[in-house]
Amino acid sequence: MLSAGLGLLMLVAVVEFLIGLIGNGVLVVWSFREWMRKFNWSSYNLIILGLAGCRFLLQWLIILDLSLFPLFQSSRWLRYLSIFWVLVSQASLWFATFLSVFYCKKITTFDRPAYLWLKQRAYNLSLWCLLGYFIINLLLTVQIGLMFYHPPQGNSSIRYPFESWQYLYAFRLNSGSYLPLMVFLVSSGMLIVSLYTHHKKMKVHSAGRRDVRAKAHITALKSLGCFLFLHLVYIMASPFSITSKTYPPDLTSVFIWETLMAAYPSLHSLILIMGIPRVKQTCQKILWKTVCARRCWGP
């Protein structure tokens, strides 16, 4: 029998999964629809498509882990699932970093030569960083795959894969998150400085007038700030999720930490939708029609 607490956690996990599934699905469909309408990929559409696609995968990986972990705790394929999970998580972080670079390039207004040089080469530098990340992670993944086929001898972790050495390699693979996170923080910091500088100029020259650029700054910072908070929750919950799977596993702790982790791909999709007026209006219309249809049909 499931306890009341575990049942509640399972309900929250299902709700988060549905929110993430619908939210990221809407963003993927919108990106494709924009491409079909214009027959031209914009940088923003590509970033949103990649970000939503990675979040969609991440949501499925979390729900698969929660569903199958109690049944296949000692299965070898769950080890590879954990490695794939890390790679998808890092890809999601890279696309969020590209989004912060996009906001920084489009919104910030500095006139310093170093900034103008960096602004012109922002996408190229980001793509080179992504290529370097891909090569390093490919080498680490091959090394980890070989270790899974030749595990340390005389260790009980062969029987219980979540006990010790495998996740040391998963943590090593996860160290690739530092570079995109640093780029993300630098881009967000430049947005904050740009907003502060712009606010000072507006106070002097155009007090009382509608400030569209300041609104764009604030909207971008809200989205990036929420992402940073949710990503930090995700990072802090990950080690506890791993340690709760050590033998004997604590199923309640696994659900607590992975439910916190699932908030990252599900809730940020809603924040992105709220920041895209056309998608927001479409979702509001669909929701309103659903409510009206339910009222017409009755209970």
Curated annotation (Swiss-Prot):
The keyword Membrane applies. Residues 23-45, 104-127, 197-223, 275-299 are cytoplasmic. Keywords: G-protein coupled receptor, Glycoprotein, Membrane, Receptor, Sensory transduction, Taste, Transducer, Transmembrane, Transmembrane helix. InterPro entries: TAS2R (IPR007960). Residues 1, 67-82, 149-175, 245-253 are extracellular. It is found in: Membrane. Its main location: membrane. GO terms for biological process: detection of chemical stimulus involved in sensory perception of bitter taste. GO terms for molecular function: bitter taste receptor activity; G protein-coupled receptor activity. Glycans are attached at residue 155. It holds the Pfam family TAS2R. The chain crosses the membrane at residues 2-22, 46-66, 83-103, 128-148, 176-196, 224-244, 254-274. One of its GO terms (cellular component) is membrane. It is a multi-pass membrane protein. Most taste cells may be activated by a limited number of bitter compounds; individual taste cells can discriminate among bitter stimuli. Receptor that may play a role in the perception of bitterness and is gustducin-linked. May play a role in sensing the chemical composition of the gastrointestinal content. The activity of this receptor may stimulate alpha gustducin, mediate PLC-beta-2 activation and lead to the gating of TRPM5. Belongs to the G-protein coupled receptor T2R family. This is Taste receptor type 2 member 5. The gene is TAS2R5.
